[in-house]
A protein has these predicted regions:
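Helical "lid/coupling" subdomains associated with nucleotide-phosphate turnover
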Residues: 1-15, 21-192
Length: 192
């Protein structure tokens, strides 16, 4: 997140496989944290059940991969839209609970593996009635395109947190620029 987003007010939603973690910011301060027991695996399961296909095929279809399986596109859209609607209803309920629904000028920033689902950005915007965007990793320098994928945002965020705590002896974290390069090289080994 940018400082401007956190000052204006935004919600960061990390959509993982099993859970969704959200952090709401205003005036550069996190005002609410919530973890919800729903994730992108639920969408995969819905696709598998709805189209009567294997979980592997459902996952590939969910992520937009071209498969040999022929399926009705309209039915797939309905399945995905229904579960995304459930997800954003939960987020909306939380924002109502804290009095911030439709009141976050910087909107929702979506990260995590679930952020790669097609139409998620538009679904969030329509459901929450706030701006919506997919979070992007920015290293301030050259970074391999695969590492910009929002799947890596949590790992990336933890690394940045470690870097920012470099001089904090109470956490016992000492990260040098050599370690920073080692982390980048470690990420690169997972790239195709």
């Amino acid at each position: 997140l940018t400082k401007a987003q956190k000052i204006a007010g935004c919600v960061l939603a990390n959509i993982g496989a099993e859970t969704i973690s959200i952090a709401t910011f205003e005036n550069n301060i996190p005002i609410s944290l919530e973890i919800m027991p729903i994730g992108s695996t639920d969408i995969t399961n819905d696709i598998a059940l709805g189209l009567k296909i294997s979980l592997d095929e459902a996952e590939q279809i969910k992520m937009g991969a071209i498969t040999s399986y022929v399926y009705p596109k309209k039915k797939l859209e309905e399945i995905i839209d229904a579960r995304l609607s459930d997800i954003f209803e939960l987020i909306e309920a939380h924002l109502k609970k804290i009095g911030r629904n439709e009141l976050l000028p910087a909107g929702i920033i979506i990260t995590g593996g679930g952020s790669n689902i097609s139409a998620i950005e538009e679904s969030a915007k329509t459901s929450l009635k706030i701006p919506s965007k997919i979070g992007e990793i920015s290293f301030g320098g050259i970074i391999h395109p695969e590492l910009k994928n929002s799947v890596y945002t949590v790992a990336y965020g933890l690394c940045i947190f470690g870097f920012s705590q470099e001089n904090d002896e109470s956490l016992g974290v000492k990260i040098t620029s050599i370690t920073k390069n080692n982390i980048i090289n470690w990420f690169k080994q997972f790239l195709p």
